[in-house]
Regions:
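Start-transfer (signal-anchor) and selected internal transmembrane alpha helices
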Residues: 1-90, 191, 280-288, 424, ...
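Interfacial juxtamembrane loops and adjacent helix segments
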Residues: 111-165, 313-321, 383, 452
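Transmembrane-helix motifs of polytopic, lipid-linked glycan transferases
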Residues: 170-194, 227, 231
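Membrane-interface transmembrane helices that cradle and orient dolichyl/undecaprenyl
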Residues: 194, 232-247, 358
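Short helix- or helix-capping micro-motifs
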Residues: 199-210, 230-234, 248-256, 270
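Short acidic/glycine- and proline-prone juxtamembrane loop motifs at membrane-interface regions
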Residues: 217-224, 339, 392
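Perimembrane helix-loop-helix junctions
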Residues: 237-238, 264-290, 294, 349-363, ...
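Membrane-lumen/periplasm interface segments of specific transmembrane helices
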Residues: 280-353, 368-381, 400, 428-450
Length: 533
């Protein structure tokens, strides 16, 4: 590209961004297009910064070449990020949601060797971690009539000695290290699947951002579950000997102890073992799995008097089958408080990858799809698909390794279409996560379905940003229409991405600011004049 063409391309990118922001300050334009009011707040300067970065890239017109730092450097980088953020956030805000319950279970296990929390609640042990009040979360009673916690005992068991040694901050440090290790495992899976160092690095960066970044310093089962799942899958796909196959079985068998919703994922890993392991490693895998399953059943029988893995809930909970799968899918993707894409837009590339031959022809695609569907299936029919009062995308954290590996298959191909946005999407999600965590006292990471989303309020201008994102906790037809608008925009981008692979003029649309600005304008118009009318 000649210097004059570079200059025109750079100026065009700046013009699109500056033009949109400039229109927002014209009263007549805002009256006609109310959504422009969102640019009269912090998002206006954000758009200008993005436009400036795109203009600089068009002016320089140099391909971005990033080498593979290797697993140890990636682990150290991830650990420093998670530890620094976790220490800052944990020091500035007490626990909430399910966190005090997991910590109280850990305290009871270490100090008293049991999970009878009646005395812990009587002493208000939760005051060590939160001002409360904290109401008990009890499931089905034990066979002797005593109450038993509704939460799975796996995470409290793992955290009990850590909590005894250093309290909540030590637990945060342990989860931060687990998150860093998870991202390295994802990097290895991506290298195996895509075979390109740049693709592996992108997969690591996607995994290290939200939502894993959120749960790397919250006391929930999501990061340990994702790590156990990803590590077990990586071992099974690596042609292991009997010893490593047994370790894969141990990791897969740990999933039900962390949360009962992970039982289908554990079963799927067993199917992957059957597909990939020869006789001796397969025997070692199932020897461990059988022993762990027997232990799980014995635990249920000893406590509840039944062998059912769902004994904690007294059988299959009504909430597990009363949800709407369609609303859950839309919510998991687009919900303004609990969705994935508003906080981690890089996973748009994973959705695009699923529609391409590159992923379906990649190594182990069937095994990865099997495990991914097993993770997703219990969530789709769960009434509380959003996970309660918690950071965004809670129940999708165990799916992040598979989403990251999927987008890496696309990153291994020539950079065209949506892949031109890969690093801006990574940067946008990570910057938003850091903004949300920087001021713990403002509670921007803690969401509930019955109130506005704090982070979008903080980023609003004259018009609320939250107006243009759906809230799908309740089955509101208006919110469903807003979600449909975003679903249509997503499908359009994926279609254009497929066309960009073969057609240079379409690919050129992804190189500047025109396509994203026009798409956001279209979404705003549809929300204002159709979805919310």
């Amino acid at each position: 590209m000649h210097s004059a063409e570079k200059r025109r391309a750079a100026l065009a990118a700046l013009a699109w961004a500056a033009g949109a922001v400039g229109l927002a300050w014209l009263p007549a334009a805002q009256r006609s297009l109310p959504f422009l009011g969102v640019l009269r707040g912090p998002l206006g300067p954000v758009l200008l910064v993005v436009g400036g970065c795109v203009a600089a890239s068009r002016w320089l017109d140099r391909p971005l070449r990033l080498g593979d730092p290797g697993p140890w450097r990636l682990f150290v980088s991830g650990a420093l990020l998670f530890l620094a953020l976790g220490s800052h956030y944990g020091s500035g805000l007490r626990v909430s949601g399910d966190e005090p319950h997991y910590l109280m279970m850990a305290r009871s296990l270490w100090q008293e060797g049991d999970l009878d929390l009646r005395d812990n609640f009587a002493r208000e042990d939760w005051l060590a971690d939160t001002p409360g009040p904290v109401a008990p979360h009890y499931g089905a009673p034990r066979k002797d009539g005593r109450p038993f916690p509704a939460h799975s005992p796996g995470l409290p068991f793992l955290l009990a000695p850590i909590y005894a040694a250093g309290g909540r901050l030590a637990c945060i440090a342990a989860l931060a290290m687990a998150a860093a290790f998870l991202c390295v495992v994802v990097h290895g899976l991506a290298l195996r699947t895509a075979g390109e160092p740049a693709a592996g690095l992108l997969a690591w960066a996607a995994a290290a951002g939200p939502p894993v970044l959120f749960y790397g310093f919250h006391i929930y089962t999501e990061v340990p579950s994702a790590l156990a799942l990803a590590a077990s899958l990586a071992l099974l796909l690596s042609a292991p000997g009997p010893g490593l196959a047994a370790l894969a079985g141990l990791l897969a068998s740990a999933l039900p102890w962390l949360h009962v919703k992970m039982i289908p994922a554990a079963v799927a890993l067993g199917l992957v073992a059957i597909l990939h392991l020869p006789r001796r490693p397969l025997a070692a895998f199932f020897a461990v799995v059988t022993a762990m399953a027997a232990g799980y059943g014995w635990f249920s029988h000893a406590v509840f008097g039944t062998w059912s893995p769902l004994a904690r809930y007294g059988g299959l909970p009504q909430d597990a089958t009363s949800g709407s799968p369609l609303r859950a899918v839309l919510g998991l993707l687009f919900d303004r408080s609990f969705g994935l894409l508003p906080y981690a837009p890089v996973f748009l590339l994973a959705l695009a990858a699923f529609s391409s031959r590159a992923w379906w022809k990649s190594r182990d695609a069937v095994s990865q799809a099997l495990v991914g569907l097993a993770v997703l299936a219990p969530v789709l029919t769960w009434r509380m698909w959003w996970g309660g009062q918690c950071p965004p995308a809670r129940f999708l954290v165990p799916l992040v390794p598979l989403l990251s590996v999927a987008l890496s298959t696309r990153a291994a191909l020539p950079v065209r279409g949506l892949m031109r946005w890969r690093w801006p999407l990574v940067g946008t999600g990570t910057a938003l996560a850091l903004f949300m965590a920087a001021r713990p006292g403002e509670l921007m990471l803690l969401n509930r379905g019955d109130r506005p989303t704090r982070v979008w309020e903080a980023l609003s201008g004259d018009t609320a940003v939250g107006r243009y994102l759906p809230s799908l906790v309740q089955p509101d037809p208006v919110e469903i229409r807003v979600a449909v608008v975003w679903a249509m925009a997503t499908v359009l981008l994926i279609v254009l991405d497929r066309l960009a692979v073969r057609r240079d003029p379409v690919d050129a649309w992804f190189r500047g600011m025109g396509l994203p600005v026009l798409l956001l304008v279209a979404v705003g118009v549809l929300v204002d004049f159709w979805a919310r009318g």
